[in-house]
From Swiss-Prot:
It comes from the Eukaryota. The modification Phosphothreonine is found at T163. The ATPase activity is increased some 4-fold in the presence of RNA. GO terms for molecular function: ATP binding; ATP hydrolysis activity; mRNA binding; poly(A) binding; ribonucleoprotein complex binding; RNA helicase activity; RNA stem-loop binding; selenocysteine insertion sequence binding. A motif (DEAD box) lies at residues 187-190. Residues 250-411 form the Helicase C-terminal domain. It catalyses: ATP + H2O = ADP + phosphate + H(+). This is Eukaryotic initiation factor 4A-III.
């Protein structure tokens, strides 16, 4: 892409041009010593990596890449905050690939992600960018065969991307050897360091060599996370976007007032034709609700697919494959989908339930406007949700209007 290099999956999306001025509006609250490197050619990257970057379809680094890649390559600990769809994944992937010694068939970089799908996507992106480097990269995730993990790790992997539980398990079994690890990347750190993953990350961290470089990347960095970074980062460089900038421009946000829960379903059915203009994701807060809504939609003869964390890994993979290819157009999901999964053609998000915490809101709707294309987010709001909606508006300094009749024209 000309203005932003974002880890996309379809060729056309990669080539999509963003206007130059779109990037200049992004304000960074950044450590003073961070300079801007405007092209990939001037970053001092190895030749075979540059080939991979251009072959992937990237042309010009995005704002976060212009600032972060050079610092990571220098060996600095980095806290990078950037909006969804601005190329965060490519930022650390390019940096990791640059720092590898390909002759040494040992794990030199470890990337932790909160979901299996995100870990697999990171692995695929690394293999694509490192296509000319002969890089070995394995996704170490729960729900897959442990024996296969052990076999792959014994063969030797330069980079391991994975979920904290399985990665720690592999370290404990001594299948994943940590002695050569130079860099730890925490992707979607706000989610990772939330209660569920905090302990596991510390467990993994204790096994790493003392001089390991730490890179932490996320869309939102609440205060308590910045406090935690003090524990395992040394004099980190900060590359931060002002929070006001965090709701993506180009995403129109609306609400539909529904007096009670039962009315949400009728509203969704009325909107179905609008949903299928491109592709849509519908978010519910619980797995049970996802299953219930999927069944109810199918009973009413609407075609939908669904995904949540309790489904077997294989099933989730095939659902994602269908959705990416466009074979399925409407996906009902829990927040497992909200983090970092690129499907360029999604331009409509529906919050059937408002998210349980306001941090999640940006992860959900930050999907629909990726690559600078316009997107629409529609929030179903019961009477007792009005307070939550106002809180979200205030938190992100944004405005959420009542949905107009002609919403289909906006997609």
């Amino acid at each position: 892409m000309a203005a932003t290099a974002t880890m996309a999956t379809s060729g056309s999306a990669r080539k999509r041009l963003l206007k130059e001025e779109d990037m200049t509006k992004v304000e960074f609250e950044t450590s003073e010593e961070v300079d801007v490197t405007p092209t990939f050619d001037t970053m001092g990257l190895r030749e075979d990596l540059l080939r991979g970057i251009y072959a992937y379809g990237f042309e010009k680094p995005s704002a976060i890449q212009q600032r972060a890649i050079k610092q990571i390559i220098k060996g600095r600990d980095v806290i990078a905050q950037s909006q969804s769809g601005t190329g965060k994944t490519a930022t650390f992937s390019i940096s990791v690939l640059q720092c590898l010694d390909i002759q040494v068939r040992e794990t030199q970089a470890l990337i932790l992600a909160p979901t299996r799908e995100l870990a697999v996507q990171i692995q695929k992106g690394l293999l694509a960018l490192g296509d000319y480097m002969n890089v070995q990269c394995h996704a170490c995730i729960g729900g897959t065969n442990v024996g296969e993990d052990i076999r792959k790790l014994d063969y030797g992997q330069h980079v391991v991307a994975g979920t904290p539980g399985r990665v720690f398990d592999m370290i404990r079994r001594r299948s994943l050897r940590t002695r050569a690890i130079k860099m730890l990347v925490l992707d979607e750190a706000d989610e990772m360091l939330n209660k569920g993953f905090k302990e596991q990350i510390y467990d993994v961290y204790r096994y790493l060599p003392p001089a390991t470089q730490v890179v932490l990347i996320s869309a939102t960095l609440p205060h308590e996370i910045l406090e935690m970074t003090n524990k395992f980062m040394t004099d980190p460089i900060r590359i931060l976007v002002k929070r006001d900038e965090l709701t993506l421009e180009g995403i129109k946000q609306f609400f539909v007032a529904v007096e009670r829960e039962e009315w949400k379903f009728d509203t969704l059915c009325d909107l179905y034709d609008t949903l299928t203009i491109t592709q849509a994701v519908i978010f519910c807060n619980t797995k049970r609700k996802v299953d219930w809504l999927t069944e109810k939609m199918r009973e009413a003869n609407f075609t939908v697919s669904s995904m949540h964390g309790d489904m077997p890994q294989k099933e989730r993979e095939s659902i994602m494959k269908e959705f990416r290819s466009g074979a399925s157009r409407v996906l009902i999901s829990t927040d497992v989908w909200a983090r970092g999964l690129d499907v360029p053609q999604v331009s409509l998000i529906i919050n059937y339930d408002l998210p349980n915490n306001r941090e999640l809101y940006i992860h959900r709707i930050g999907r629909s406007g990726r690559y600078g294309r316009k997107g629409v987010a529609i929030n179903f709001v019961k009477n007792d949700d009005i307070r939550i909606l106002r809180d979200i508006e205030q938190y992100y300094s944004t405005q959420i209007d009542e949905m107009p009749m002609n919403v289909a024209d906006l997609i």
